[in-house]
């Protein structure tokens, strides 16, 4: 391949160092710039605290993203497209600029990092290569979080395991792979993965990565002419930074993340140290998932570039030195790189034949050497010219070494790593022992894979147990809190028990005092019992007097209840009549609530209140009657005006009808005159035709007479006479025709005018007819309304008369009730006076206690009377306010109902919007899931082949290659 460059079989890891500028917090803290850059052309050394470090390249803080990419990563693009594996990862402490170096700002041509630039470069190189090459590119994106591999393209895959393929190359089993055909597809995958990556805020970095991310680009290419297949993997790794808890202030989950990050980075450092030592036979790749994934990149088949990112601040001097030491050790690690070529059956066969021929030649040479060796062992001295020259043997055995070396480089390089690892053991171990050891290693690796699976299952089981333990701890914490609550409650109860004991003691003392007092009181009670017996005798006497008064009072109550019933019946009848009158006067309005059944059990105050309401209703009906009378007078006036307008309309209608009849007669006469003119026209036309016939006859006679010479003169005379007659006839005919035409034009003009007038009259007639019908309809409506008003007025007049009679009746009944009340009060006062006199005539009018009781009862009666009157007044006021309050309540209820309806509609609308939004979200998710499933998942994926020398190629069903894409070729991005 022309774009290939020569790469040695053994290649050192390339280490570049990049320093970021001081940030704001470091400048505010007063940190100094402790790094020094010696002035050399190559820019490959750095000095800190007097110690110099050498790297492949050192970038100062002002180095641009483009410069970093060109120096550190651009060369790997051609290696990957040539079939080699490549790895680029950034190493350093937290907030040292690793993510900025690897990703940067995607889409910004100045600030974008290595990953977007290398993606654009890969596609640009593909589009510029030979046309007969076809590429298939797929990408994976996952992170190592809390020492668990989590797929960033499918968040449901949270604990993936690492396995090895048939060539012992580690890979992440079950990771999502997406086929891509353009840089835009790759950027979409990157953005999707970035949105799922774990980040957090620490004291040193607002966007601190909490996991190691691995972005894998797998490029497979096929030469369509010779079916040669190459494959290359490019690992783009963004490591999480090492942290010091004292500086980052991590706690809780962030602290656990920091522990796992430091643990995996420590394992990475151990692997680098073991590889740099060169004498260790065991490399601890399996100590961490990170080193297990990067096994091929560290001492394996890959071209690796490490970007160590450092801080120049004195605050981070110790971490910077540690990072520089890591880079210096990594620079000594050697990788064995080879082309990942998939040979065809013919190629394997050809190589087999060559190796077979080579083996046969070598066997012949070995036999010669064995013969010579046997002669030497037999004591025979072999002459110099008979001795076999080893240099000639090697040259003869490998006549085409240069050609074969290029063809067998892949097979030899694939075994180079194993030869290096087994170099110290190959001298003492036989071939059979090596085979046994290889089988044993295979078995041990298989056991390790099984153990990985078991560890994965055990980790999941441990997660479940951890959740159960957390639940149990929560239950224990709740039980502990309840126990503490019960302890405090028990302490409180004990305190209450102690206080209760003290109270019991006090109560016992009080009981003793009460016992003493009881004896004293019992004596006093005996004395009082004697006094009570005497008072009981007096009470019996007073009770008899009270019973007599109670009997009389009951009789008075019966009379009063009888009077109340009579008053109630009268008011019931009165209110019923008032209700009927109100319905007659204002049937559409709400009348007073007259529930007669409710008046039966009411008292006098209720009757007075209802009577007050009746008087108010009567005054209201009077006002309504006056309003109705006024409206009736207005309606009568309007009816008179309407009758006048109707008569005027009828008069105008008669005149218009007369005009219409006149115009119709005139039109008939005009039509007759037109018919006469038409007849005259026809007569004149007939005369013209007859004259033309005579003229033709005369011409024929003239022609006949031309032969006769004798009649020539006569013919001339006749001809002259005939010409003169014809001229006269022609003139007369012309005059008549012109007169007839003028007359026809005048008649036609007159007819047009008559038609216009007739049309206007027809329109006016139709308008008048419509107005007449409308007036008639309004008159009918007014007449019906007037009849209704007259009937209503008559009913109201009758109701007014009935109301006047009812008012007289009510006044008489009220006067009667007033008189009865006066008589009842007088009788009651007389009876009370008699009782008072009788009581005073007894012994001193009773005891002092009874007098006090009577005065107390009288005061209570007066107070109750006042309260009752006040309640009656308040009740009347409330009855007046009740309609207004009911109206306001109805308005409020209507408003509440309207608001409830609006709220319900708003909730329904919100629910509909929410359902629609949820439906759209589910639909989008389903579409995205289907899109993702179309590109990944357990089912077969349709590859997106990319043909070199042009843009992305369209594909048919089943992944077959179609014609070239009409899309324009992607322009190279300035990297």
Swiss-Prot record:
GO CC terms of this entry: actin cap; axon cytoplasm; cytoplasm; dendrite cytoplasm; kinesin complex; microtubule; microtubule plus-end
InterPro entries per the UniProt record, alphabetical: Kinesin-like_fam, Kinesin_motor_CS, Kinesin_motor_dom, Kinesin_motor_dom_sf, P-loop_NTPase
Chain positions covered by the region annotation Microtubule-binding: 180-321
Protein keywords: ATP-binding, Coiled coil, Cytoplasm, Cytoskeleton, Microtubule, Motor protein, Nucleotide-binding
Subcellular location: Cytoplasm, Cytoskeleton
Reported phenotype of the disruption mutant: Flies display impaired action potential propagation and neurotransmitter release at neuromuscular junctions, but are still capable of transporting certain membranes, including synaptic vesicles, to the nerve terminal.
Main location: cytoplasm
Coiled coil regions, renumbered to chain: 335-931
Gene3D superfamilies found in the cross-reference section: Kinesin motor domain
Domain of life: Eukaryota
UniProt comment concerning the protein's domains: Composed of three structural domains: a large globular N-terminal domain which is responsible for the motor activity of kinesin (it hydrolyzes ATP and binds microtubule), a central alpha-helical coiled coil domain that mediates the heavy chain dimerization; and a small globular C-terminal domain which interacts with other proteins (such as the kinesin light chains), vesicles and membranous organelles.
Subunit architecture: Oligomer composed of two heavy chains and two light chains.
Homology family: Belongs to the TRAFAC class myosin-kinesin ATPase superfamily. Kinesin family. Kinesin subfamily.
Name of the featured protein: Kinesin heavy chain
Gene designation: Khc
């Amino acid at each position: 391949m022309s774009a290939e460059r020569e790469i040695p079989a053994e290649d050192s890891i390339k280490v570049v160092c990049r320093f970021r500028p001081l940030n704001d917090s470091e400048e505010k803290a007063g940190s100094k710039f402790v790094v020094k850059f010696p002035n050399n052309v190559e820019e490959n050394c750095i000095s800190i605290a007097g110690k110099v470090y050498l790297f492949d390249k050192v970038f100062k803080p002002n180095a641009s993203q483009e410069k970093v990419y060109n120096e550190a990563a651009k060369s790997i693009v051609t290696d990957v497209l040539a079939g080699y594996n490549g790895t680029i990862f950034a190493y350093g402490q937290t907030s040292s600029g690793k993510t900025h170096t690897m990703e940067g700002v995607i889409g910004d041509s100045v600030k974008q990092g290595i990953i977007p630039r290398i993606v654009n470069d890969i596609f640009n190189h593909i589009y510029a290569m030979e046309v007969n090459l076809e590429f298939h590119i797929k990408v994976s994106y996952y992170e190592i979080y809390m020492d668990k591999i989590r797929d960033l393209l499918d968040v449901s895959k949270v604990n993936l395991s690492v396995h090895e393929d048939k060539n012992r190359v580690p890979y992440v089993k079950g990771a999502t792979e997406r086929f891509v055909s353009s840089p835009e597809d790759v950027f979409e995958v990157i953005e999707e993965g970035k949105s799922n990556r774990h980040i957090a805020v620490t004291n040193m970095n607002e966007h601190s990565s909490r996991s190691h991310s691995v972005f894998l680009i797998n490029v497979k290419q096929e030469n369509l002419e010779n079916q040669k297949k190459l494959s290359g993997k490019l690992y783009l790794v963004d490591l999480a930074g090492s942290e010091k808890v004292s500086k980052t202030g991590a706690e809780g989950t962030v602290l656990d993340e920091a522990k796992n990050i430091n643990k995996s980075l420590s394992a990475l450092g151990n692997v680098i140290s073991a590889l740099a030592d060169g004498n260790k036979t065991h490399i601890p790749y399996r100590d961490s998932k990170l080193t297990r994934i990067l096994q091929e990149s560290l001492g394996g088949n890959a071209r690796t570039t490490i970007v160590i990112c450092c801080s120049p601040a004195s605050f981070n001097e110790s971490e910077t030195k540690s990072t520089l030491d890591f880079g210096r050790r990594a620079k000594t690690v050697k990788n064995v790189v080879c082309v990942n070529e998939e040979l065809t059956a013919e190629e394997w066969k050809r190589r087999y034949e060559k190796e077979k021929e080579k083996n046969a030649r070598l066997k012949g040479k070995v036999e010669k050497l064995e013969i010579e060796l046997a002669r030497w062992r037999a004591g025979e001295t072999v002459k110099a010219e008979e001795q076999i020259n080893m240099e000639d043997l090697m040259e003869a055995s490998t006549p085409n070494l240069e050609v074969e070396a290029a063809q067998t480089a892949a097979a030899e390089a694939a075994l180079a790593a194993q030869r290096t690892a087994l170099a110290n053991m190959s001298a003492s171990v036989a071939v059979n022992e090596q085979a046994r050891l290889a089988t044993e290693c295979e078995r041990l690796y298989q056991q390790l894979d099984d153990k990985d699976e078991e560890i994965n299952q055990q980790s999941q089981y441990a997660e479940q147990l951890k959740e159960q333990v957390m639940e149990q701890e929560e239950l224990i914490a709740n039980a502990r809190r309840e126990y503490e609550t019960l302890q405090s409650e028990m302490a409180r109860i004990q305190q209450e028990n102690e206080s209760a004991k003290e109270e019991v003691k006090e109560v016992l003392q009080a009981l003793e005092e009460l016992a003493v007092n009881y004896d004293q009181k019992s004596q006093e009670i005996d004395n009082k019992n004697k006094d009570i017996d005497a008072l009981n005798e007096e009470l019996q006497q007073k009770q008899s007097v009270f019973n007599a008064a109670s009997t009389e009072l009951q009789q008075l109550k019966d009379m009063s209840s009888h009077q109340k019933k009579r008053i109630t019946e009268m008011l019931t009848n009165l209110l019923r009549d008032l209700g009927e009158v109100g319905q007659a006067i204002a049937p559409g309005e709400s009348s007073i609530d007259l529930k007669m059944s409710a008046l039966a059990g009411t008292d006098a105050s209720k009757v007075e209140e209802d009577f007050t309401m009746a008087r108010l209703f009567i005054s209201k009906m009077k006002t309504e009657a006056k309003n109705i009378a006024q409206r009736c007078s207005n309606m009568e006036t309007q009816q008179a005006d309407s009758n006048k307008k109707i008569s005027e309309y009828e008069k105008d209608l008669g005149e218009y009808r007369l005009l219409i009849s006149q115009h119709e007669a005139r039109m008939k006469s005009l039509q007759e005159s037109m018919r006469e003119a038409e007849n005259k026209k026809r007569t004149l036309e007939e005369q013209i035709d007859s004259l033309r016939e005579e003229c033709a006859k005369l011409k024929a006679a003239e022609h006949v007479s031309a032969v006769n010479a004798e009649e020539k003169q006569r013919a001339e005379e006749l001809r002259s006479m005939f010409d003169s007659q014809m001229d006269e006839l022609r003139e007369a005919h012309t005059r008549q025709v012109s007169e007839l035409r003028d007359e026809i034009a005048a008649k036609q003009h007159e007819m047009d005018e008559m038609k216009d007038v007739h049309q206007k009259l027809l329109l006016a007639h139709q308008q008048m007819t419509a107005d007449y019908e409308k007036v008639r309809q309004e008159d009918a409506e007014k007449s019906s309304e007037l009849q209704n008003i007259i009937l209503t007025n008559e009913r109201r007049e009758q109701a007014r008369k009935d109301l006047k009679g009812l008012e007289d009746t009510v006044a008489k009944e009220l006067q009667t009730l007033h008189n009865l009340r006066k008589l009842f009060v007088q009788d009651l006062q007389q009876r009370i006076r008699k009782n008072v006199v009788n009581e005073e005539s007894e012994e001193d009018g009773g005891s002092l206690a009874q007098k006090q009781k009577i005065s107390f009862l009288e005061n209570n009666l007066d107070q109750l009377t006042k309260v009752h009157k006040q309640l009656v007044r308040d009740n009347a006021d409330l009855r007046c306010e009740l309609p207004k309050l009911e109206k306001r309540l109805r308005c409020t209820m209507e408003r509440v109902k309207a608001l409830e309806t609006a709220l319900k509609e708003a909730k329904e609308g919100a629910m509909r919007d929410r359902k629609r939004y949820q439906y759209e979200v589910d639909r989008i998710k389903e579409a995205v899931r289907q899109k993702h499933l179309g590109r990944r998942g357990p089912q077969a994926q349709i590859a997106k082949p990319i043909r070199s020398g042009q843009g992305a190629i369209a594909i048919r069903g089943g992944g077959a290659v179609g014609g070239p894409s009409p899309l324009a070729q992607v322009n190279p991005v300035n990297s």
